[in-house]
Amino acid sequence: MLWLYSILLAAGLAALSPVLWLRDRRSGRYTRRGGERLGRLPRLDGEGAIWVHAVSVGEALAVERLIGELGRQFPGRPLVLSVTTAAAREVAERRITAARVFYFPLDFRFSTRRALRAIRPALVLIAETEIWPRFLREARKAGARVVFVNGRISGRSFARYRWVRPLLRGTLARVDGWLMQTETDAERARDLGADPRRVEVTGNLKFDLQPPESRALLRQLTGHFRGAGVQSVIVAGSTMEGEEEILLAAFGQLRQNFPAALLILAPRHPRRFEPVAKLLAASGLPWSRRSQIESDGIRAGGVWLLDSLGELAPLYRVADAAFVGGSLAPHGGHNLLEPAYFAAPVVFGPAMHNFAAIAEEFLAARAAFRVESGAELENILRRLLSDDRLRISAGQAARALLEAKTGATARVLAYVAPLLAAPPSGAMVAAAPPQP
């Protein structure tokens, strides 16, 4: 059945080619290092490599600590990290220095085989259950152990995978480990054809996050805050199209009562920096941008556009309130754990299905606030800026919940260590699960 899958994949890629070409005309990201997507990689020095795959920025940051621990526990093994998006590559190359970073190959036999011959992995760890049937089969044929880590199967993904379950079942049954975030994810993995003996609930790696402190940036900002007279800060992280207008309208009302407040606006995708800048220019609000901080500074009662990558997380340390983007627009929400790490009160909209279980836990612990509209957003931000007790208690509850959920990294390491000690898997020979 993989021949049919390959035909459908090729047809889909052909259909998307005009879109990718248009994007590449603007950014050059799709043809730059395009050979990597065809599996053209320099041969890796050393034996028994560990290959970690993470699609985008969120997944790459989730495995950051795991990669560091793998390097410490298995110092003789080369480490590589493959990604799918250009933004993930940029962030990973800057933050995850223990691994060589490259683009994941297209899921054709020729490209996956070529990449596997170059890397020669003993172990492949795939973050968040991204299922590429051809790669999974070729990796097992090459003798690599394959484990899904931080596994998550959303309701939408589960419905899609069930349509192609006959195609997937034989391959998925031979995966060496399914280390899932929740029992719901584990049950869905078993339903899709995973060997029940190899399915475990290990928790969410994102709870083990260690965001960069970036003290130099914070010192710089503190100086600008003092100079501008900023007294309170709202950080809106990973915003999506349609949300900036809502945030600006809410902030426009808030600044009438909090004239020394500052809104830090961080769009999710770099390609939206300029459209958001144009929106700010037309808003009538005072604003400036990160890339021009030395010339433009920061303005109290205004907006600061974070047009950079890798600097959002440490800004939550100075936040009096943190809005999680992708949740008012219907995108499923983004990471609410980074603001929680810095004890910032968390606010999000109704569309949090990508983090549904975590969002509900935060709401139950009174560590977050859910809003349904711009008016509700303005109301809760007003409460957080004016009520010190509410703001501090919500932030402390968020941090406490985060700390109570740590430990997934250690559980993943305990599972994969016996696999690395075992002989190679051989051609599609199922490995026995590690003993508890």
Residue locations for each model-derived region?
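Nucleotide-activated sugar donor-binding and catalytic core shared by glycosyltransferases
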Residues: M1-P436
